[in-house]
Amino acid sequence: MILIAGAVYGGVLVLLYWKQESLLFFPTRLPHDHRFSVSDVVERPVDVDGARLSALHFRQPNAKGLVFFLHGNGGSLEEWVTGTEFYRRTGFDLFIIDYRGYGKSTGRIESEAQMHADVRAAWLSIAPEYAGRKIVLYGRSLGTGLATRLATDVEAHLLVLISPYSSLRDVARDHYPWVPSALLRYPLRTDEWLPRVKMPVLILHGERDSVIGIAHAERLHMLVPSTEFVRLQGVDHNDVHLSTEYLDKLAERIGNL
């Protein structure tokens, strides 16, 4: 019986190792001719190695700068861009991408290194147009690790992390303690990158987050005490954008750049 149980356990681990993309990423696919419901954005795809990323750009006259937005692990740009009122309020443009296999983006996610390379390519496609103006790197959930890694290599004026993780390995350990963390091919070590970030950092995290516990944000804040850390009372993981405290704090911080 012990041998059988061991064989089953080993088989499950092998399956998890090779199929973990299906456990980490939950894209919504869109047809290539899909028309986005938000009318005041333009499509601006980004060519990357072996694929093309769907991206949306909201631009307004005399913008103060740009919010470079990296979203979470589910949905598509159709769900992530529901309006531009916040950006009009703060005077900032928006540039947001769908990862490979999300929305209208082609290809599929194959490695963490590939994701970082894609994010950097997207950055290089837009950032030069905002030279001399303020740029905000914004990461939400999955996007927080990607944004933090990018922030170690580029010049911007603020890094915003919404519902961040110390690492995806730590998140996996929270939910699947029986799985050896070394098997995760997407460790996304925010805890290693954040101390290397030179720009100001704002962290907002829901106190009731049931997906990425607030302990992750607390750990990051302890690593870099100079970060501004805001606990969102009564807020879970998927309702952050509905929090008045979140919207007001973000608008204040970005608007004062």
Model-derived features with residue positions:
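An N-terminal hydrophobic leader/cap segment in hydrolases
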Residues: 5-47
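Membrane-embedded segments
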Residues: 52-125, 133
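Alpha/beta-hydrolase fold nucleophile elbow
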Residues: 130-141
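Active-site nucleophile loop of the alpha/beta-hydrolase fold
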Residues: 156, 160-170, 186, 190, ...
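Short beta-strand/loop motif that positions the catalytic acidic residue
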Residues: 197-198, 203-205, 209
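Conserved alpha/beta-hydrolase "acid-adjacent" motif
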Residues: 210-216
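Catalytic histidine-centered segment of alpha/beta-hydrolase-like enzymes
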Residues: 235-245
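Catalytic active-site module of serine/aspartate enzymes centered on a nucleophile-bearing elbow/loop
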Residues: 243-257
